[in-house]
Amino acid sequence: MNTQPLRVGIGGPVGSGKTALTLALCLALRDRYNLAVVTNDIYTREDADFLVRNQALAPERIIGVETGGCPHTAIREDASINLEAVDQLNRRFPGLDLILVESGGDNLSATFSPELSDLTIYVIDVSAGDKLPRKGGPGICKSDLLVINKIDLAPLVGASLELMNSDTQRMRNGKPFVFSNQKTGVGLEEIVAFIERQGLLTAA
């Protein structure tokens, strides 16, 4: 049995689908694992409220952190506010298996502190254009898993998934990535399998 929960950081630009992915992961994993969530917003608890409204988990299992500044700082340079939220959840629910830490929307240079996250998932979306993987940055190149979301929008924005696939392979140098559409569940099974495999999770 794990003495400490697996902490999975979910990052990405504003509007890429981080909260939708967090919701989908909660719904997929909550019956198998002892699970909790920390969300980050600059001035509100909007993402936490969204998860509560959509019954992702019991409200007491979701903590919304108001960072009050650059969301990057709260997950990297000074992660204390998030670490305190993680500690609070551990005290509230002894024996947690998994804590999802969703960052506030940020730029392509955002990364999680190793003190806060054991695995990182970075979410980008097709509506930003097929050139996005080529722009690189730590999230695209170095995250443990890259999720390319909203693939259904590719025809609407003139984005080539084939080009995104080849560019992403080149930029990630063998690291895994998944194409997804959280509205329909495409890619979710692969993301769940990645978390379980890389996080060494064993369902009760």
UniProtKB/Swiss-Prot annotation:
UniProt function note: Facilitates the functional incorporation of the urease nickel metallocenter. This process requires GTP hydrolysis, probably effectuated by UreG.
Subcellular location: Cytoplasm
Subunit architecture: Homodimer. UreD, UreF and UreG form a complex that acts as a GTP-hydrolysis-dependent molecular chaperone, activating the urease apoprotein by helping to assemble the nickel containing metallocenter of UreC. The UreE protein probably delivers the nickel.
PANTHER family referenced in this protein's UniProt entry, alphabetically: UREASE ACCESSORY PROTEIN G
Binding-site residues, GTP: 12-19
Top-rank taxon: Bacteria
Organism: Pseudomonas fluorescens (strain SBW25)
Keywords: Chaperone, Cytoplasm, GTP-binding, Nickel insertion, Nucleotide-binding
Protein name per its UniProtKB record: Urease accessory protein UreG
GO annotations of cellular component type: cytoplasm
Family membership noted in the UniProt record: Belongs to the SIMIBI class G3E GTPase family. UreG subfamily.
GO molecular function, one term: GTP binding
Gene Ontology BP terms: urea catabolic process
Major subcellular site: cytoplasm
